[in-house]
A protein has these predicted regions:
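Conserved small/polar residues in nucleotide/adenosyl-binding loops
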Residues: 219-223
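Small-residue-rich hydrophobic segments that form or flank transmembrane alpha-helices
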Residues: 13-79, 141, 156-218
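Membrane-interface helix termini and inter-helical loops of multi-pass transporters
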Residues: 2-5, 94-102, 193-204
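Small-residue-enriched transmembrane helix starts and helix-helix packing motifs
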Residues: 2-25, 132-146
Length: 223
């Protein structure tokens, strides 16, 4: 993929740098913020190509967040979510295999719509949410998170809703979220590189230019 053909104008660069800034801020626990970057990049560079462009940015932000909060994760929740998330991950790959390429943008749009519905549901239920004690609650959010992260890198709000619903403290929330996505996002790299051909040496150079904007998470971290 020739990324030089996709990023040609100051507007394209502006969208890329703004998205990196948003992603960096989202890693500090600002619920739903990362959803803004997904449609921005998809509209600018195309639905499927944008997933390969955004993934290294997410991986850099995840690594910084883990280095910053590495000692305060609640691992029992990471281990509870990961198996179902991997099932969702594989399910997303199977769905991608059977749909025509032109339908990917609709699938991504559907994932974003589902995430928004879950966010609205969470706000509506508020403190009255009694489902978090059900046995299927964690696996459901893991499955949904795995599917939506593979298709649209849109699982941030899904995980935020789950971790907040189990009454996780602020610092533990950020640390647990960071470790979960570090594992999931780094697992996605081989798929993007070798199956979807969305990550190239050229795209990685472009992503490297966004690092100063990602570093904003160090200044917006909760204190």
């Amino acid at each position: 993929m020739e990324w030089s053909m996709l990023i040609q104008s100051p507007t394209d660069w502006g969208i890329l740098f703004l998205s990196a800034l948003i992603i960096g801020m989202s890693k500090t626990g600002i619920q739903g913020l990362s959803l803004i970057s997904v449609p921005l990049l998809a509209l600018a560079f195309g639905a499927k190509p944008s997933t390969g462009l955004i993934l290294p940015i997410l991986c850099i932000a995840d690594l910084i967040a883990v280095l910053y909060y590495r000692r305060i994760a609640e691992w029992k929740y990471v281990f509870k979510l990961l198996p179902a998330a991997l099932v969702g991950f594989i399910l997303a790959l199977l769905v991608d295999k059977v749909i025509p390429p032109a339908a990917f943008k609709h699938l991504m749009g559907g994932c974003l719509a589902i995430v928004l519905l879950v966010m609205f549901w969470s706000e509506w239920k508020g403190k009255e949410n009694k489902l978090s004690s059900c046995w299927w609650y964690g696996p459901f959010f893991g499955l949904l998170g795995g599917f939506t992260t593979m298709i649209g890198n849109a699982a941030g709000p899904v995980m935020a809703i789950y971790l907040l619903s189990v009454k996780m403290p602020k610092y533990s929330f950020v640390g647990t979220n960071a470790w979960f996505f570090l594992v999931i996002n780094y697992l996605k790299i081989p798929v993007q590189m070798f199956a979807w051909n969305n990550i190239t040496s050229q795209s990685l150079i472009i992503d490297a230019l966004t690092i100063p904007f990602i570093l904003c998470l160090l200044y917006t971290s909760p204190s």
